[in-house]
């Protein structure tokens, strides 16, 4: 069965035409013509963004993009891919190594400095460091946050050949230290770290991606100059010293006596490239990794604190992604002309297609991250011996934050960049094989409204879990006893200002916020430091947008996302997208269950709205809000806001 980019059935001949158009676009990509400016200069692109039928290029090359919906199967949505056949369960799931600190004297290059090191490196002819702003106070000021940090790392962004499947050739990826995902940073609250991030990426991108980068610590309470602002990119041959304070929010403002609010503790973060205009390509090419924070309660040791399963043996980070591969060569491909959203027909866990994980019959903490680029997930545990049976488990976090208490769930829904920590007791599956299955049928990159949840065993099996390892002592607390974690910080105070944001698309196909495009140089509004604001987010079209705000977390006041339902493909029936969502003409609902939490990304499904409240404490500088369907982000669904001593009251920026 074949579909076009609108989810409509088409003939095999029509699908082949779409595929050939994609191949034409790839020829342009390989020739280095990856920007609209290049194509307009050559007369191949109109000002409205349409490809012109010229030199054999199909007029459908733009309209029927690879991220459309041309599925050749009836499973959980394969996009417009035609990747080579790969055998599942041929490789063990990689667990990225934990990054080890080094001595300050072991850093390559000059010693770290508070101000950017703009001295010219004679070997490259450009500045040693790509940073353009100084580390802000209190870093290095009166010793409050020591500089350089006592814990220092050096990581190299470099090209490497990586195996994703024995049935595909080695893939030439952008990596951190030769790995994708990159190494895992295991950090602790109260211990600042400095990471010297070296850019050693080559000029030859192999068809897509760019070798100037900006690394963002997603969900970090990070000073602006180290946040990975999309326009703070640095070139190949330079380094960038990023300082992560690892301090609780409020440590300089609302909770100085306790060195921050313990209820603002973070746990599961991740890092990824954030280069303006190229985030999707560089992330797709491999620039992602895990960052984990522990404290005196979430300790990484199941005999202390909250007694969650011990890291790293029983606490395992997992990154989910989907990718397309060339049907002939087996090489990773990316459609740079796609502005809607790219879906792959191969599902990866920690960089490998459909791997295997062997576990012991005991409780594990699994940290799930959806890295996209555009696919929404709804993950179930499936036993193929009884695929329709419910296999509930416990969700203990939403994004990077522990819930007040564990919540038993049948599944977890994840938009791009959303995270969930879950606890699964594998003792109930001793000697068995089970699977993590994505049952959300997403036929195209827009993320809805034609998606629905398929039955057990009819979706896409992403990970095979074999419970065959020796029995191990389990000192972790049973989540069924509903232990308490953190208390939600109060957001009952009146906001200093309420701002409204509409996420939409202009007539040229560019994604917008309040009808405006992203600018590196212009802040749309200024937030007053240490204030509370309410932001009302709305999505009036048939698209889904996972909206991420940098710098601090929010709480969803109204319009919280629920699990996707199993409704039919009636596009007027939006109930499938979760009973907690508000649609046009309905009254919004308050958050409950797993959404009664702190978050940094909120899913706006078609015609939905959500109201969030958040504080902006401790740091100043420039930050962004954007759609984390990174295709939308790269095509301007992003805005810059600044945090300063004095803020404005612009309600519709």
Per-region residue spans from a language model:
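Non-catalytic, beta-strand-enriched accessory regions in extracellular/secretory proteins
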Residues: 171-173, 177-184, 344, 349-356, ...
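Extended terminal and domain-junction accessory segments
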Residues: 64-152, 280-321, 388, 398-546, ...
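Extracytoplasmic beta-sandwich strand-turn segments characteristic of Greek-key/jelly-roll folds
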Residues: 180, 185, 213, 217-264, ...
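Short, cationic motifs built from Arg/Lys/His that form the positively charged side of catalytic pockets
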Residues: 36-37, 367-370, 499
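N-terminal secretory signal peptides
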Residues: 1-38, 60-62
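A long-range scaffold signal marking pre-active-site subdomains of enzyme folds
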Residues: 56, 62-227, 231-237, 241-268, ...
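Histidine- and aromatic-rich segments of cupredoxin/plastocyanin-like copper-binding domains
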Residues: 219-248, 320, 324-481
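N-terminal twin-arginine translocation
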Residues: 28-41, 47-79
């Amino acid at each position: 069965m074949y579909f076009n980019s609108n989810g409509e059935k088409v003939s095999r001949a029509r699908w082949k035409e779409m595929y050939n158009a994609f191949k034409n676009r790839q020829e342009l990509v390989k020739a280095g013509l990856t920007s609209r400016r290049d194509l307009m200069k050559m007369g191949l692109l109109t000002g409205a963004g349409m490809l012109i039928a010229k030199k054999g290029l199909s007029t459908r090359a733009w309209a029927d993009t690879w991220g459309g919906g041309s599925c050749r199967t009836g499973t959980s949505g394969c996009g417009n891919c035609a990747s080579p056949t790969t055998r599942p369960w041929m490789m063990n799931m990689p667990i990225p190594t934990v990054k080890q600190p080094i001595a300050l004297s072991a850093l390559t290059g000059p010693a770290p400095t508070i101000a950017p090191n703009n001295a010219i490196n004679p070997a490259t002819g450009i500045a040693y460091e790509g940073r353009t702003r100084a580390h802000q106070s209190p870093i290095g000021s009166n010793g409050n946050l020591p500089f350089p940090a006592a814990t220092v790392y050096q990581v190299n962004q470099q090209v490497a050949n990586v195996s994703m499947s024995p049935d595909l050739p080695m893939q030439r990826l952008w990596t951190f230290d030769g790995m994708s995902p990159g190494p895992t940073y295991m950090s602790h609250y109260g211990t600042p770290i400095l990471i010297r991030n070296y850019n050693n990426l080559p000029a030859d991108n192999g068809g897509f991606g760019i070798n100037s980068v900006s690394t963002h610590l997603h969900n970090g309470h990070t000073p602006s100059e180290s946040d990975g602002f999309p326009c703070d990119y640095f070139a190949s041959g330079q380094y960038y010293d990023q300082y992560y304070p690892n301090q609780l929010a409020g440590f300089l403002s609302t909770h100085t006596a306790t060195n921050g609010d313990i209820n603002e503790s973070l746990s599961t973060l991740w890092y990824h490239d954030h280069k303006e205009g190229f985030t999707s390509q560089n992330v797709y090419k491999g620039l992602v990794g895990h960052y984990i924070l522990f404290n005196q309660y979430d300790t990484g040791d199941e005999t202390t604190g909250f007694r969650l399963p011990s890291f790293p043996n029983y606490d395992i980070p997992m990154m989910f992604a989907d990718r397309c591969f060339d049907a002939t060569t087996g090489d990773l491909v990316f459609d740079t002309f796609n502005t809607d959203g790219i879906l792959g027909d191969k599902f990866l866990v920690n960089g490998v297609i459909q791997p295997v994980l062997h576990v012991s019959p005991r409780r594990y903490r699994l940290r799930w991250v959806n890295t996209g680029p555009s696919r929404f997930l709804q993950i179930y545990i499936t036993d193929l011996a009884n695929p329709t049976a419910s296999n509930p488990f416990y969700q203990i976090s939403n994004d990077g934050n522990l819930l007040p208490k564990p919540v038993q769930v049948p599944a977890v829904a994840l938009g791009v960049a959303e995270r969930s920590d879950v606890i699964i007791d594998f003792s109930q599956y001793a000697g068995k094989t089970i699977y993590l299955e994505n049952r959300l049928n997403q036929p195209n990159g827009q993320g809805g409204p034609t998606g629905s949840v398929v039955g057990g065993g009819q979706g896409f099996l992403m990970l095979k879990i074999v419970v065959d390892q020796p029995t191990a002592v389990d000192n972790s607390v049973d989540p069924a006893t509903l232990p308490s974690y953190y208390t939600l910080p109060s957001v009952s105070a009146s906001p200093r200002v309420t701002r409204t944001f509409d996420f939409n698309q202009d007539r040229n196909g560019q994604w917008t916020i309040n009808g405006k495009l992203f600018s590196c140089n212009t802040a749309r509004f200024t937030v007053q430091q240490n204030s509370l604001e309410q932001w009302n987010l709305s999505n009036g079209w048939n698209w889904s947008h996972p909206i991420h705000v940098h710098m601090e977390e929010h709480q969803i006041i109204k319009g919280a996302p629920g699990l996707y339902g199993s409704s039919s493909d009636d596009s007027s029936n939006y109930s499938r997208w979760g009973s907690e969502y508000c649609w046009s003409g309905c009254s919004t609902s308050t958050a409950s269950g797993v959404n009664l939490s702190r978050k940094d990304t909120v899913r706006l499904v078609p015609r939905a709205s959500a109201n969030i409240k958040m504080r902006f404490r401790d740091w100043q500088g420039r930050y962004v809000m954007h759609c984390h369907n990174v295709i939308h982000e790269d095509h301007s669904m992003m805005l810059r806001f600044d945090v300063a001593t004095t803020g404005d009251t612009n309600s519709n920026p």
